[in-house]
């Protein structure tokens, strides 16, 4: 490792992580962004944007399995799914494993992201872009959810952190648009950062989402790349019962879907909705 340069993440002040860089595959630094993809011996291929790790080959499966199978199996009868972002294709890969889904729409603001990730992160999409149920829409996510005539059973917001371009996907305008195009009984989920370090983000999302949905909460997963504690995923629906389904129901749906996962299982599904007390306290604070 001493012979390899080190790449340091810059997400948090006074605290962080680094990766040794075995080989830089791509690096573009402009006035608008700093994008790098490199190989790391421990985590495989790593993609970082503006000094923040977005995904790695080693542990991406945890994030993407939890962002897809939790809402889809909780819903139980999703036919039309919307993915906001997700240009690396891994979210599409996991959604497409549910054969009962009829349409998968993905909204990505930059067409170049998709072609770029297909070239440099082919294992993420694993051929899912060729699924005949899939439609790619090049548009801003906020604009799409507020203008589309389509409706969806599950909406997955695969957003970056709420800084720079990703900030719009944490706004009331976005959440209102998602409610607008979500079918009755539908589920909205979104990544919401590591709550121990980014607690204000969770509190802000909870407050805004509560204006549009009757049941707003979070679920969690431990993802090594997103260090600092558990990662939280926002959950919003008008049907609170979907968050409290019995393990027997989830097990039956999991079996029917014929899924084989590396992180997700029905027990993880149920346990994921148990949140630490400090988050409960923050969400209930006046």
Curated annotation (Swiss-Prot):
Q: Name one GO molecular function term.
A: spermidine synthase activity
Which parts of the sequence belong to the PABS domain? Answer: 5-238
Q: Which domain of life is it from?
A: Bacteria
User: Which SUPFAM superfamilies does its entry note?
Assistant: S-adenosyl-L-methionine-dependent methyltransferases (SSF53335)
Binding positions (S-methyl-5'-thioadenosine): 33, 108, 140-141, 165
Q: Which UniProt keywords apply?
A: Cytoplasm, Polyamine biosynthesis, Spermidine biosynthesis, Transferase
Q: What does this protein do?
A: Catalyzes the irreversible transfer of a propylamine group from the amino donor S-adenosylmethioninamine (decarboxy-AdoMet) to putrescine (1,4-diaminobutane) to yield spermidine.
What protein name applies here? Answer: Polyamine aminopropyltransferase
Active site, renumbered: 158 (proton acceptor)
This entry carries the following GO cellular component terms, namely:
cytosol
The UniProt record gives the binding positions of spermidine as 64, 88, 158-161
| Localization, UniProt | Cytoplasm
InterPro entries found in the cross-reference section: PABS, PABS_CS, SAM-dependent_MTases_sf, Spermi_synthase, Spermidine_synt_N, Spermidine_synt_N_sf
Catalytic function, reaction form: S-adenosyl 3-(methylsulfanyl)propylamine + putrescine = S-methyl-5'-thioadenosine + spermidine + H(+)
Record's PROSITE patterns? PABS_1, PABS_2
BP GO annotations: spermidine biosynthetic process
The pathway that the record names for this protein is:
Amine and polyamine biosynthesis; spermidine biosynthesis; spermidine from putrescine: step 1/1
Q: Record's Pfam families?
A: Spermine_synt_N, Spermine_synth
The record's note on quaternary structure and interaction partners says: Homodimer or homotetramer.
